[in-house]
């Protein structure tokens, strides 16, 4: 098992985007909303809630360092907060496919001035930094923004899977993060630092976010290099432990909870934002108008044609079918015998493994004729795998599964494709944090 509590430094790249046009520039490239006004160009691009936040344009000056909007498309009250806390988001390509996931931070978190220009830090995996910088410069054109790598800043992640920490985060957000206007956001961000609710004195905090991709999943924070200095205050440490863990431990925890990041998959994998559960992880706005890749995304949401989603999976030897069938959540075990079989498969080759039903039957899809007059030939069935493996570590992983399949069964088998065509089992799990 991975540690239930941990603090890690993550291999992330940080790109700073600042200048008079920074809010408009970033808004046009990501799936979350930064502009208070909605520019309506096509009827299907704006949801019916389009007029419910008209006051935002009165309290937000997009040419100043105002912060970020926090919203949840599944919140029935449709509340939007204005905060200095960071948010989860995505960059898409022009075809609506995922370019990269990211976190966006208001910069700096505290000690900001209302007279400063908009200033953001975008956090992505280090392996995707060069590609993202090229994308940003491609779209810059005449925009009055500066794009630069943020040097000598570290990305940290802390998680704690106890009810006490969950309650702590609820109170923390209510007291410091869920603010309604830029002035209050600046005041509460500074108070969080001054109160030492989390961070010790003189810790150079650059950015902060509660990771709500899954409710209260952890906290993310950016600091100038700490040189092994403990970031937490005495008050925080009196309540919670903070043992050091690896970035790999953080990734395995994501896997077992069904949370994909683009760096987890090989570069030739093409995936849609809804397939990564972006709508479930507070990374999508339906009320922001146009952005790169937006049209397909909103049409998919409104059309309700989401057939596949990423879910956590556990691999097992087929002799353990009965014990696996009784499990309700994946259990990470690097010493599981099935790991020896999986070690023969490279990350790039994972997606080519065929997931099939345990009973040996094939998933099928109707093959519809394109003729308006139908066809005299019998309707054919097109064979389709039950899903695609995207990432793995040890005996757990992430797979893109057909929702129609996993609604009826969770046990599948996979042929490794070695000399003996070894077959292993795969169990899919529907995360408990998915909206009902």
UniProtKB/Swiss-Prot annotation:
Q: Which InterPro entries match?
A: TrmE/GcvT_dom1, YgfZ/GcvT, YgfZ/GcvT_CS
Kindly list the places in or outside the cell where this protein is found, as annotated in its UniProt entry.
Answer: Mitochondrion matrix
Q: What's the short name of a Pfam family annotated to this entry?
A: Beta-barrel_CAF17_C
What keywords does the record list, in alphabetical order?
Answer: Mitochondrion, Transit peptide
Q: List cellular component terms (GO).
A: mitochondrial matrix
Query: Keyword Lipid biosynthesis on this protein?
Result: no
Q: Which GO terms describe its biological process?
A: iron-sulfur cluster assembly
Keyword Zinc recorded:
no
Say which family it is in: Belongs to the GcvT family. CAF17/IBA57 subfamily.
Name under which the protein is recorded: Iron-sulfur cluster assembly factor IBA57 homolog, mitochondrial
| Higher taxonomy | Eukaryota, Fungi, Dikarya, Ascomycota, Saccharomycotina
């Amino acid at each position: 098992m991975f540690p239930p509590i941990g603090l890690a430094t993550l291999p992330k790249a940080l790109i700073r985007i600042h200048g008079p046009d920074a809010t408009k520039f970033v808004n046009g490239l990501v799936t979350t909303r930064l502009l208070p006004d909605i520019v309506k160009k096509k009827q299907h691009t704006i949801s019916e809630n389009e007029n419910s936040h008209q006051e935002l344009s009165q309290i937000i000056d997009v040419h100043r360092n105002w912060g970020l909007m926090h919203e949840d498309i599944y919140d029935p009250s449709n509340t939007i907060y204005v905060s200095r806390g960071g948010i989860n988001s995505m960059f898409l390509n022009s075809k609506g496919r995922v370019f990269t996931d990211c976190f966006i931070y208001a910069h700096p978190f505290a000690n900001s001035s209302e007279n400063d220009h908009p200033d953001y830090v975008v956090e992505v995996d280090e392996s995707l930094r060069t590609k993202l910088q090229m994308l940003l410069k491609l779209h810059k054109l005449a925009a009055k923004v500066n794009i630069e790598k943020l040097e000598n800043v570290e990305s940290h992640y802390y998680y704690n899977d106890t009810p006490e920490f969950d309650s702590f985060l609820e109170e923390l957000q209510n007291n410091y993060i869920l603010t309604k206007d830029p002035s209050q956001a600046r005041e509460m961000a500074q108070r969080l630092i001054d109160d030492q609710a989390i961070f010790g004195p003189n810790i150079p905090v650059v950015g902060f976010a509660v990771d709500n991709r899954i409710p209260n999943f952890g906290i993310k924070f950016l600091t100038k290099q700490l040189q092994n200095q403990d970031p937490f205050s005495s008050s925080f440490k009196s309540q919670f432990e903070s043992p050091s863990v690896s970035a790999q431990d953080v990734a395995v925890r994501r896997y077992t909870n069904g949370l994909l990041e683009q760096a987890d998959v090989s570069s030739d994998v093409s995936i849609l934002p809804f397939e990564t559960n972006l709508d479930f992880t507070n990374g999508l706005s339906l009320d922001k108008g146009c952005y790169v890749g937006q049209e397909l995304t909103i049409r998919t949401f409104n059309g309700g044609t989401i057939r596949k989603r990423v879910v956590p999976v556990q691999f097992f030897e087929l002799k353990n079918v009965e014990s696996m069938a009784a499990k309700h959540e994946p259990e990470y075990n690097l010493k599981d015998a099935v790991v020896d079989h999986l070690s023969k498969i490279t990350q790039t080759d994972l997606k080519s493994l065929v997931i099939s039903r345990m009973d040996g039957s094939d998933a099928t899809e109707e093959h519809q004729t394109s003729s308006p007059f139908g066809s005299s030939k019998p309707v054919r069935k097109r064979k389709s795998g039950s899903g695609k493996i995207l990432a793995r570590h040890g005996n757990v992983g992430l797979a893109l599964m057909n929702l129609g399949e996993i609604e009826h069964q969770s046990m599948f088998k996979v042929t490794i494709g070695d000399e003996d065509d070894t077959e292993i089992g795969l169990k899919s799990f529907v995360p408990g944090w998915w909206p009902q």
